[in-house]
Amino acid sequence: MDDIFNMTVPIVVENNGRNERAYDIYSRLLKDRIVLLGTEVNDQVASLICAQLLFLESQDPEKEIYLYINSPGGSVTAGLAIYDTMNYITPNVATVCMGRAASMGALLLAAGEKNMRYALPNSQVMIHQPLGGYQGQATDIDIHAREILRMRQRLNEILMEQTGQSLEKVAQDTERDYFMTAEDAKAYGLIDKVLVSRKDLDIEHEKTE
């Protein structure tokens, strides 16, 4: 999240006729129940995303939340914290990929509420197995290798559950980087619809009401 704060964050000023109020752009989006994951997934980012999801649930436990994703992925444990929170809260969480959803970003995209998982036309989606790189004593390396295999199995199981693909196919496809277009991701079961315009999303929203 440091990358966000190192940038100039736009400020939005709202005037209701009696007074003005300034918001940073992310806080303003939060008012409309929009959460943006636009960076690598790490512990700090996961904490912020989870906090926003929990806050929006406390504001209205019935109204859906929109999670927009443009992420290269990142920490598995941080990503699973977001995944578990999405499932834990009461509101449905719709996911929208813009740009790319890779690795944990792809898993979070697929974790959206069924029939509420979207991607914009030129989005790129990529799935693969967890990356290792631990260095140390042989026994510690063995421990971490077994943990990576356990995580890989769990991530494959989640993708199987979310896509409807067989565990064997998911394991085969994630053996190496597996890139997909938005239409490919729809065919694979990672998303439900490719959105061309806001009108498409509004139509889908009306269907779910």
Curated annotation (Swiss-Prot):
Any one GO MF annotation of this record: ATP-dependent peptidase activity
Subcellular location: Cytoplasm
UniProt keyword annotation of Signal present: no
Keyword set includes Protease: yes
GO BP term (any one): protein quality control for misfolded or incompletely synthesized proteins
Reactions the enzyme catalyzes: Hydrolysis of proteins to small peptides in the presence of ATP and magnesium. alpha-casein is the usual test substrate. In the absence of ATP, only oligopeptides shorter than five residues are hydrolyzed (such as succinyl-Leu-Tyr-|-NHMec, and Leu-Tyr-Leu-|-Tyr-Trp, in which cleavage of the -Tyr-|-Leu- and -Tyr-|-Trp bonds also occurs)
Gene Ontology CC terms, in alphabetical order: cytoplasm; endopeptidase Clp complex
InterPro entries membership: ClpP, ClpP/crotonase-like_dom_sf, ClpP/TepA, ClpP_His_AS, ClpP_Ser_AS
Active site: 103 (nucleophile), 128
Any Pfam family hit: CLP_protease
EC number: 3.4.21.92
Keywords on record: Cytoplasm, Hydrolase, Protease, Serine protease
UniProt-listed NCBIfam families: clpP (TIGR00493), PRK00277.1 (NF001368), PRK12553.1 (NF009205)
Family: Belongs to the peptidase S14 family.
Subunit and partners: Fourteen ClpP subunits assemble into 2 heptameric rings which stack back to back to give a disk-like structure with a central cavity, resembling the structure of eukaryotic proteasomes.
Stated role: Cleaves peptides in various proteins in a process that requires ATP hydrolysis. Has a chymotrypsin-like activity. Plays a major role in the degradation of misfolded proteins.
Name the UniProt record assigns to this protein: ATP-dependent Clp protease proteolytic subunit
Natural source organism: Lawsonia intracellularis (strain PHE/MN1-00)
